[in-house]
Amino acid sequence: MGKEAQLVLLLALPIAALRMNIDVAAVRAAAAPFSCAILRRGDKYLAEVRGADAQAAAGRLTCYGGKRERGESSLECLVRELNEELGWAPEHIPAEPACSLLVDGYLIAHFYEASVDRADFATEGRAFEFVDEGDARWSAWHARVLAARGAVAVFDDGGDPAATLELLRKVPTAGEDGLERRYYEPL
């Protein structure tokens, strides 16, 4: 199998050892509607503790990041979001994502991994913690991404692909070329 395709193991699915081919190069080259950071300090990860009233992942842990604006690259989005949410961004963020998240075949986010050497963030009243990768409070999507670093995280739980597409159509980058491309058909 060439560099253009990589065999990806779907994690935590009820069907044991389900495998599929995904064009990882195409996924990585595509503009994702969200950019997120996997920020680590030693063996701990910086996580946003989402409030009980949060619209997404209420009461769960998530990586920091957010929606990409039109005309922004994924890295520009990430730096902007980290500065907005933490008052800080790492000096060095690799150009290549550590992981990309596909949900129901659609690209949702690129996740970039970087180190953090501080804990004095300006979080606008939001809580944060340094936690283990295996912390049970991680949101389902973020737990999947942490487990799949270096590959593509696929999240198919038998949900409605139309709902995922509807989510994509609500972000600022809606309508951009390729945003509604499916990288595989859920089984």
Model regions and ranges:
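Classical eukaryotic N-terminal signal peptides for Sec-dependent ER targeting/secretion
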Residues: 1-8
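N-terminal chloroplast transit peptides
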Residues: 9-12, 16-19
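N-terminal strand-loop-strand
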Residues: 21-62, 90
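The catalytic Nudix box helix
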Residues: 64-98
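Short histidine/acidic/glycine/proline-rich micro-motifs that form metal-
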Residues: 67-69, 102, 137
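Charged phosphate-binding loop/patch that engages nucleotide di/tri-phosphates or the phosphate backbone
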Residues: 143-187
